[in-house]
């Protein structure tokens, strides 16, 4: 829906970019720049920098393209936008049409891609659609992203039985565990961090995500499971870790190796392993699918932990 609503603005921004030479570098500015980095770094044909701070790199100027995601139109990105205008950078901002960021973005070399949902992923897809069309980003196919999200919404629906609902099953498994979330590819790793954030907010408990080398010590330090413990009669013990693997289908040798090491460490300590999978057809759609599945699980966990 966001891409459809911004179609005219995207076309105008593409037309404007066609009249300029390819930028020296692409700078994704503002606090929501990390998702763009995960998508663009392996693909962008020019140097790419994610700059989540409130300003721009000192070298940024008229030869560079600055892209900003501001799904809520808040002030956190306004200073970077104003600085890009002042320096004469090519600037493309995805934000609500009536907000402080849009006001600061007014300039000769600026384009605003209007969004209304306030959702970070939807706003990012709008920007990625523009970057694809100016040959600075990979194919996104917003319709396939939407289809992947619809499939997750159906599979994880509150009306779907526990036995066939992956989000409900994951939430139950996490009820007495500390989530250790891992994704192997760049986008799966980004989804893992977002899922861990959602789990922390939902439960008020620890939930960690990171590279395999950072998670292995956590799994290896877990005390072996005591098979004689009665969970109903004995005093509650410290929550044990549980490995949550976000599998986007990547078969790169390094990803396979790291997944194997994590699963072996978990098996050696009796740590439970749960896997979220997706068969969505594009990288962004797979990211969206994994993140939404994890978000559903976090919400079900929150509901399950509410005291009567």
Indicate where each model-derived feature is located.
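Phosphate-moiety recognition in structured ligand-binding domains
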Residues: 1-13, 89-97, 101-116, 120-125, ...
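Active-site phosphate/pyrophosphate-binding segments
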Residues: 1-19, 112, 116, 132-235
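Glycine-rich phosphate-binding loops that contact phosphosugars or nucleotide phosphates
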Residues: 19-154, 248-251, 261, 265
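Short hydrophobic beta-strand segments
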Residues: 23-30, 176-184, 242-247
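N-terminal beta-loop-helix "entrance" segment that forms/cooperates
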Residues: 35-40, 59, 216-225, 283-284, ...
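Residues at alpha-helix caps and immediate loop-helix transition turns in enzyme cores, especially N-
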Residues: 36, 191, 195, 255-258, ...
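A generic structural motif
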Residues: 48-55, 93-96, 205-217, 272-281
């Amino acid at each position: 829906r966001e891409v459809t609503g911004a179609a005219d603005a995207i076309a105008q921004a593409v037309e404007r970019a066609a009249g300029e030479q390819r930028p020296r570098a692409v700078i994704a500015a503002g606090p929501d720049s990390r998702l763009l980095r995960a998508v663009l770094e392996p693909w962008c044909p020019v140097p790419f920098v994610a700059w989540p701070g409130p300003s721009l790199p000192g070298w940024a100027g008229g030869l560079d393209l600055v892209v900003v995601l501001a799904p809520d139109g808040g002030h956190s990105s306004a200073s970077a936008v104003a600085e890009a205008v002042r320096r004469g950078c090519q600037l493309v901002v995805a934000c609500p049409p009536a907000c402080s960021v849009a006001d600061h973005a007014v300039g000769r070399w600026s384009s605003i891609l209007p969004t209304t949902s306030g959702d970070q992923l939807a706003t990012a897809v709008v920007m990625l659609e523009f970057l694809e069309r100016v040959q600075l980003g990979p194919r996104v196919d917003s319709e396939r992203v939407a289809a992947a999200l619809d499939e997750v919404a159906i599979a994880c629906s509150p009306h779907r039985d526990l036995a066939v609902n992956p989000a409900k099953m994951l939430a139950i498994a996490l009820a007495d565990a500390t989530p250790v979330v891992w994704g192997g590819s760049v986008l799966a790793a980004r989804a893992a961090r977002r899922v861990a954030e959602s789990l922390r907010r939902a439960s008020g408990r620890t939930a960690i995500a990171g590279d395999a080398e950072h998670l292995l010590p956590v799994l290896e330090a877990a005390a072996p499971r005591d098979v004689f413990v009665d969970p109903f009669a004995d005093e509650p013990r410290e929550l044990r870790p549980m490995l949550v693997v976000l599998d986007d289908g990547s078969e790169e040798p390094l990803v396979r190796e790291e997944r194997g090491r994590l699963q072996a460490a978990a098996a050696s300590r009796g740590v439970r392993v749960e896997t979220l999978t997706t068969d969505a057809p594009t990288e962004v759609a797979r990211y969206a699918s994994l993140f939404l599945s994890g978000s559903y699980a976090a919400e079900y966990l929150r509901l399950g932990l509410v005291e009567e």
